[in-house]
């Protein structure tokens, strides 16, 4: 026959065990979105270069307030920008030259993507034709190593 104190101890033990499992379950559910550069393609025509960037996200949650920074080749101006993107200011002596483009991508759902296409003028002949892109969001990223890419064309 169980005494009242034994029943109380068993009830307390069961309550503690179920609470501990619930806490462990909450710890394994982490808010995260692996935002990444999926594609960076750069093409060249006679007078322009075009960079096509695809930003993708996965790992359960949406990437909130996603942003993309495009580092432009030296000595280029902007030919075409998509909505939501703005070029950094150029130097006072040659205001047409730009260093970077910043894009607000909004929220990207899990397994969703955003595509951005930017066209620039060609840099002077001896300058490298290299684009660098970096993406990030307000959601914690479990794998930040895939947030950057760069391409150089001839």
Model-based region annotation:
Residues 1-9:
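Bacterial N-terminal signal peptides that target proteins for export
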Residues 25-34, 59, 87-88, 134-154:
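Extracellular/luminal low-complexity Ser/Thr/Pro-rich, glycosylation-prone repeat/linker regions
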Residues 44-64:
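Short beta-strand elements of extracellular/lumenal beta-sandwich folds
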Residues 56-62, 73-75, 123-125:
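Short solvent-exposed strand-capping/beta-turn motif centered on an Asx-Ser/Thr pair
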Residues 65-101, 106-107:
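A surface/secretory-pathway sequence property marking extracellular, secreted
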